[in-house]
A protein has these predicted regions:
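Conserved alpha-helical substructure of the radical SAM core
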Residues: 1-74, 78-89, 93
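Conserved, mostly hydrophobic/aromatic
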Residues: 31, 149, 301
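Core AdoMet radical
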Residues: 22, 42-51, 65-80, 91-110, ...
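Flexible mid-to-C-terminal extensions adjoining Fe-S/redox cofactors in radical SAM and related proteins
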Residues: 257-314
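Radical SAM enzyme [4Fe-4S]-AdoMet core and its adjacent flexible, acidic
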Residues: 134-246
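Short loop/turn motifs at secondary-structure junctions
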Residues: 34, 66, 121-122, 162-166, ...
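Alpha-helical scaffolding segments of alpha/beta enzyme cores, especially the outer helices
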Residues: 57-60, 82-92, 113-116, 148-151, ...
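C-terminal accessory regions of radical SAM enzymes
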Residues: 233-267
Length: 314
């Protein structure tokens, strides 16, 4: 029994899937950045991407089942040739469409079309900006990324984002610590970005770093693995359990495989029925009531104020 399971047992809690609200599509590992905290291990040299035949099956499923939200992530999902078609299909089906954007992709050659495309389809942008100061951003995401991110945010503002279209930012701690209070940090971000750069955005989401992939490698290299897991376990908040995203989100890989969350996907903890299930094997109702696969990494979502792809939970 791992530390997360012990916490569930202590609090007499269990995790089961509820009605599906969000279909989260991870459509590849390729990215124009290679961030230190990235749980996907995304990078420019990664080649995994969504193939046209798989994309067509996913689009058929969206047309049939019309989930409330289609959340598209990666990598930099915009690098995938199937990205445009997925956005168009989900938008036409009446779904809220979310793009998890690293911002710098907007400044890459041949991607000048993105801001106008986003606004045309009223895509909600959730963009990573781990700090409102250059030092921390460049440390976590690479030299020059802060300045590019600011330019990209200003470009999005020019296309109505932060006003008529939703623009949210994401904060990750730089090191092995819990995020600060989300509402207080949001106020700091808004003041700094508006005063220094004239930037407007809607909400800030704080997300706890998952002890997997590159961040796990950093923890072990710094001999802080046990210390960080102990911090997460000691900060367990049972009030976060009811709002965990794995209850209502279905994560789908670029090959169509199913997972309870994107973090489980990176650990290959497939949803199975004797064998790994594909999206086109199921309906949303088929998943309701199924136990959620968990591991020690789940402590990151239940520590402190809780954590999810849309920020704090409790």
């Amino acid at each position: 029994m791992n530390r997360f399971e012990k916490q569930l047992q202590t609090h007499k809690a269990s995790l089961k899937r509820e009605a599906l609200l969000t279909l989260q599509l991870n459509i590849g590992r390729q990215c124009n950045q290679a961030c230190r905290h990235c749980h996907v291990d995304a990078a420019p040299w990664r080649t995994e991407t969504l193939a046209p035949d798989i994309a067509n099956r996913i689009k058929d499923w969206i047309r049939t089942h019309r989930p409330q939200t289609v959340d598209i992530t990666g990598g930099a999902p915009e690098l995938c040739p199937e990205f445009r078609g997925l956005v168009q299909t989900a938008s036409k089906a009446g779904c809220e469409v979310i793009d998890r954007c690293n911002l710098t992709i907007l400044l890459e050659d041949n991607f000048e079309w993105l801001p106008e495309f986003f606004s045309q389809h009223d895509v909600t942008i959730i963009a990573s900006l781990p700090c409102y100061q250059p030092k921390n951003v460049n440390h976590q995401r690479g030299g020059g990324v802060f300045d590019k991110s600011i330019r990209a945010l200003q470009l999005l503002n020019q296309h109505g984002y932060g006003e008529s279209h939703a623009l949210h930012l994401v904060y990750n701690p730089v090191g092995p610590s819990l995020p600060p209070d989300q509402s207080e940090l949001e106020a700091d971000y808004k003041e700094a970005l508006h005063c220094d750069f004239g930037i407007h955005f809607d909400r800030l989401f704080t997300i706890t770093n998952q002890p997997i992939a590159r961040f796990a490698e950093d923890l072990r290299r710094q001999d802080k693995w046990d210390e960080y897991l102990e911090l997460l376990s000691n900060s367990f908040n049972p009030e976060s359990l009811e709002s965990l995203m794995c209850r209502s989100t279905l994560s789908v890989s670029h090959e169509g495989d199913l997972f309870d969350c994107d973090f489980n996907q990176m650990l290959e903890l497939n949803i199975r029925n004797g064998k790994p299930l594909k999206l086109w094997d199921i309906t949303p109702a088929d998943l309701e009531g199924r136990p959620i696969l968990t591991g020690e990494h789940c402590l990151a979502c239940t520590a402190g104020s809780g954590s999810s792809c849309t920020g704090a939970l409790a």
